[in-house]
Amino acid sequence: SHPARPDEGYRDGEPAKDLFPADQLADHFPRLRIAAPLKISDQPRVAAGSRPPFPAPDQPSFYPKLRTMLIALLLAFTATINAQTLKTVPYRWKSVQMVGTGFVDGIVFHPTAKGVRYARTDMGGAYRWDPKANRWMPMLDWVPFQDLNLMGVESIAVDPTDPDKVYLACGTYTNRTTPDGAILRSSDGGRTFKITRVPFKFGGNENGRGNGERMTVDPNAPQRLLLGTRHDGLWRSDDGAVTWHRVDTFPSTGGARGAGIVVTLFDPASGKPGQGSTHAWVAVSDAEGPNLYESKDSGATWAPVPGAPSGLFPTHMILGDDEALWLTYGSSPGPSRMNAGAVWKLKDGNWTDVTPEKGSFGYVAVSVQEGKPDTAIVSTFGHPEHEQIFRTTDGGKTWRPTIGGKETYDYSKAPYIAHTGIHWLFDIEIDPANPNHAIFTTGYGGHETFNLTDADKGKPVIWHAMATGIEEAVPLQLLSPTKGAQLVTAIGDYGGFVHRNLDKPVPEGNFINPHFGNTTGVAAGDQAPDTIVRVGVPSGNSRAGNIGYSLDGGKTWQTTKTAPPGARNGHIAVSADGKIWIWSLSSAYRTTDMGQTWTPVTGLPSNPRVVADHVDPNLFYNLELFGGVLDTSRDGGATFTGKSFTLPGGLPHRGGDRMDARAGQDQLYPTPGKADDLWIAAFDGLYHSADGGGNFTKLPQVEQLHAFGFGKAAPGSSVPALYLVGTIDGVRGIFRSTDGARSWAIINDLAHQWGLVLQISGDPKKFGRVYVGAHGRGVSYGDPK
């Protein structure tokens, strides 16, 4: 088997300070990213009785290190020349407060250290709890674009003997085109990480992502870890996750319809500190064959646990203080649909079915109270009435429901969830340091209570929104109106918000009337910013309509009287005076009476994306980038005329690292404050026309682009500030120009990269303010320091 290799270190996104020469170079060139040589202490090494690392080093050699150092220095020299043309403007970054807006699929408490806990998400990184700030803190904002796969976190493990050590198994998808995953290890509570690349993939955003935990630390030998994978079997590390080797004696990789190995667990009572645990269990997502295995010889051999249930997929497993093993099961790994489930308990070799309630739903999580092993809670998935949390105080003999009765909810920290049904409770945890404190996760974040034991007294349990600091939205469009609200966000799954205070959750919640799932387009008139129009698709089974508009800057909303036939999703353009709206679908439709009537637009190809000029209310455009045609309307969008154009160096080609078609690349951007002034933000370059598209010039420094936007002009300047996400002069980052793209300044640092950035927009009301929308990491806003 091929062991994993350690290769990189990060400190809040910066190269680790003990890696030469990256430490010295990073001090002088903060945007420079160098693949630093391995530390000697991190070199793969051969353990007795194991297969040698691949490639197997015969002896330590000076020459590979020298070669690596020379390459790094050459790269640094090249980057130095490029960096001389780029200024750096330090920015202060904060998250726009939406709170949650995505699936938190796992919570991990440290078993002995009070206040130490972590949260993982399916595509938005991982978080550590900060008890002083009383909020979650992102741990992976340093992840660069080239490593965006690491933003999906498959599993988290903590060292029971050291509250500062935490491990993350990172990787979003297991498909053929996605890179292999990595194990991130930290010795300071997730503030800094070192990376070990592994020769297999993780599926942080795939079916079964709420199962777990797949990775665990031996409490009696904390340098030893077990890791379950989706398709590549069981892996083990004996050096604190620096190197990994496949456990070839483990007999299963998981069923064809399952999610691989979903839980690994050591038995602390089977060993002594410093000697290691001899007994361990592994649960496999398999409903057709054996799905629970154990080893009683420190992992040398494995065998199915006698009498274990079959026919369902294990979802969670936990060991109580009394050596009782609790498991939950469903008819799928989830969050695909479940129509059956069970809860089982193994104690003293005897299996007992302790399912609280049978039905056409599954069970997905279980937690046992520290010090009281007969007290446990379990959560359901797919319950026909509403999701449920059952609680027992007698080891599963009897259960009481805790949802749908006397409980109350405090939505003040995330008002939008008041009308978002509780769903996807794939983890539920009782705080080992406080039996009154429990957390359950959801598709929008989660809830926590501080009076859980009141349920045993028949008193109401109060559940509070618990996701402050966690921001998982996928921004599909960002709008900063010329006056009024600071920002309007169009996001996936939860519609979007009108933000008047970026540092507090929106008190009225997300968009309603209509309430969208995905908002795919939002626009306002530059000269009439109180007129805001949004399009998308309603959430759930709602029939509220696929378009909403506001005439008071987003304070209130209403639906149009009519809509084009079959209209849903698409994009919306609003004329500069707010009176003409054009809805781009498979074809385009136009209204001049706020949606009472719609007429087809003529002269456009299929699947257009019409945009409005920011000055002339009768002027609209549509870009056919790959065909080299610019469609223009000067009659208020009633008819369009196409005209061919050329670009210096030729038209762009499809393909490349575009990553997500919803990003702001390959689009046309009319300039605020100037009619007939256009920018093409293509993936492979930035182009400008000052004559309505008659002629385009290419901006020479821009090599690659993912997002583009405008902001308020700098003091004394007549041109709007430009903001760009991409690569300029060989440097990848977030950039600002205040002189019409003649020069650029870098405005982000290595601690703020957010994986894949989809959208960027400046603020027309405040110079320097910029909004950055990242894939699964919400929206951040920046101001110059």
Residue spans for each PLM region:
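Blade-level signature of beta-propeller repeat domains, shared across WD40, Kelch, NHL, RCC1
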Residues: 755-785
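Conserved Ser/Thr-centered positions that define the repeating blades of beta-propeller domains
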Residues: 128-130, 160, 186-187, 237-238, ...
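Beta-strand-rich domains and repeat architectures in extracellular enzymes and scaffolds
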Residues: 96-124, 432
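Short glycine/acidic-enriched loop and turn motifs that connect beta-strands
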Residues: 124-125, 172-177, 232-233, 286-289, ...
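Loop/turn-rich, solvent-exposed surfaces of beta-rich toroidal or solenoidal domains
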Residues: 423-437, 441-446, 670-690, 696-740
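Conserved blade-ending motifs and adjacent loop-strand segments that build the rim/top face
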Residues: 361, 409-416, 465-478, 513-520, ...
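Surface-exposed loop and turn segments in beta-propeller and other repeat-based domains
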Residues: 141-147, 197-206, 250-254, 401-419, ...
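Signature of short aromatic-glycine-proline-rich micro-motifs recurring in repeat-based ectodomains
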Residues: 102-106, 150-157, 208-214, 258-265, ...
